[in-house]
């Protein structure tokens, strides 16, 4: 698995925190100092923390587990969708719906409704309706796409959350904590790291920084999935070898 280097993080501006007057004292140990009233994050902490989180992600993916990518603020939304799609993982990149995890039964009903509308739009059902009815159903489908389109194939609760900006996504983190779902989170100098199992101290606003985190997590997912596929091949080969040995033994008898 490829690891992220300090050079990668420096180029992306991961070390630039928030203005010193907005800091959260709980992030004290991750702060190197200040420059022009901006806190500087100590990347000596960020590099091992990020790579530790990536190993955790890779191990989960190898077991075919699901990592839910969460980033609903404007700077993160597009990147989160692209990287989650690339890794074949679920995502939430618009508004987090309260109860998305803790009330998943209700969310599942919405997913079912969304799938029904998708089917109807493709099988000719919409062609039999009035323009007004089609317009209303399309609006409903668009609304569902924005809110749950990224989790329609999740198939149940995720096994971990990967979160950009833990303060902005506090509701998601609280729901995950309540259910015992591990949280991997990018935590800036103004944020509260409580409730985050894998704290990645770093800038959570710069698009280049968000791209580095999301790409690294997606790459780790793909690495884990490819390892799982490789192990599956080995298992098949071992079984085939055992079958051949049994066949040879039977013939010799």
From Swiss-Prot:
Keywords: Ribonucleoprotein, Ribosomal protein. The keyword Ribonucleoprotein applies. GO terms for molecular function: structural constituent of ribosome. GO terms for cellular component: cytosolic small ribosomal subunit. Signal peptide: none annotated. InterPro entries: Ribosomal_uS2 (IPR001865), Ribosomal_uS2_bac/mit/plastid (IPR005706), Ribosomal_uS2_CS (IPR018130), Ribosomal_uS2_flav_dom_sf (IPR023591). Gene3D superfamilies: Glucose-6-phosphate isomerase like protein, domain 1, Helix hairpin bin. GO terms for biological process: translation. NCBIfam families: rpsB_bact. HAMAP family: Ribosomal_uS2_B. Belongs to the universal ribosomal protein uS2 family. This is Small ribosomal subunit protein uS2.
